Amino acid sequence: MRGTRAAQRYAKAILSLAKDKNSAEAVNEDMISISKTVVNSRDLENMLTSPVIKDSTKKSALLEIFKDLNTITKGAIDILLENGRIGILHLVARQYIIKFNELNNVRQAVVTTAVPLDKELEAVILSKVKELTGSEASLKSVIDEDIIGGFVLRVGDLQYDASVSRNLRRLERELKDNTYVSKI
């Protein structure tokens, strides 16, 4: 992905400054908000990457959308604008979140279900992840109706698949490979 290396460098610098100013948590909240908003708004992403739109317009739009930003986050936006890198703002935000989580020993857990999870089930899953990994986790929920039921949990390179579709595939494979029943 274009700009990822630069985004990592900006994120590292922002995190370093935020740690020095004891604002890492507040900046993380800003970055989560920025990342979600830019990813969910194609128009905003297009505006940020457009060479036709003036930087002053981009800055005023960002400050209007994100009214309660930390001064460090505002400074980061200014630096990105000055360096002509505002188009990678969402990548910087994503990299900041990753680095912040690494710093705080928080792992990313991705749970895939056929239906949305309620808050109680999310809490149970997070406690199980903490029990299994020994570290805190943030939960990302993905809805995939193809798994039919159950769930698939991924934490780092570990995966636990308790989906109905997996069990059906396993059953199908066992029936096809059954040596006791002659092939019809």
Curated annotation (Swiss-Prot):
Signal peptide: none annotated. The keyword Ion transport applies. It comes from the Bacteria. Gene3D superfamilies: N-terminal domain of the delta subunit of the F1F0-ATP synthase. It is found in: Cell membrane. GO terms for molecular function: proton-transporting ATP synthase activity, rotational mechanism. It is a peripheral membrane protein. SUPFAM superfamilies: N-terminal domain of the delta subunit of the F1F0-ATP synthase. NCBIfam families: ATP_synt_delta. PANTHER family: ATP SYNTHASE DELTA CHAIN (PTHR11910). F-type ATPases have 2 components, F(1) - the catalytic core - and F(0) - the membrane proton channel. F(1) has five subunits: alpha(3), beta(3), gamma(1), delta(1), epsilon(1). F(0) has three main subunits: a(1), b(2) and c(10-14). The alpha and beta chains form an alternating ring which encloses part of the gamma chain. F(1) is attached to F(0) by a central stalk formed by the gamma and epsilon chains, while a peripheral stalk is formed by the delta and b chains. This is ATP synthase subunit delta. It comes from Christiangramia forsetii (strain DSM 17595 / CGMCC 1.15422 / KT0803) (Gramella forsetii).
